[in-house]
Amino acid sequence: MPWRKDRFCWDALLLAGGRSLRMGTDKASLVVEGVPLLQLQVRRLREAGASTVWISHASGPAPSPSRHEDIRWIADGAPGLGPWPGMRQALQASDADALLVLAVDLPAMTPCFLRRVANPASHGVGRIPETPHGLEPLCALYPLPAAAVASEAIAMDGEPSPRRIAIRGIREGWMQVMAVDEADAPALVNWNRPGDWSPVAPGTGA
């Protein structure tokens, strides 16, 4: 959706193309709160206000849910290079003002937290959470010009990481840091191994 003076519009990209080697099974298919984690994260992004939800998945057939009017699929055509190829495709294809990127394996994420991330100080500026452990580039808002910046970086020294792009944005003023306090930090804890999984999202109770 185009920029309007009275509204800031953002799309979301859900990163679900990882190989999940340590987990041993596709993280996006783990059942949490009675539904696959992929579906739960799509629901949260919609509740937070995403105009369109994109999903970056591994090459091959799109995972379930395979069809929905509000979902657009991006096949990872460059496996092994991390999340940036999918992010670049979505940034180039989106006509919103910014793209909120979210890793699928953050089970305690909430629509409220996502709305905070998607609330930049001004148009053309992105936002990235920072905890005591560092920046969180896989739950961050990237302004659309980030695609052009990344293309410059690729031409100079190869495929960039989201962290490097975010750090450059902070340095140049088109990304702002959102401090995360101790109460909200669990929203950014991800699942990596089988012992991390629970059918109930962390912090929601039994």
Locations of the language-model features?
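Nucleotide and nucleotide-moiety/phosphate-recognizing core
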Residues: P2-P160, I167-A187, G195, A201
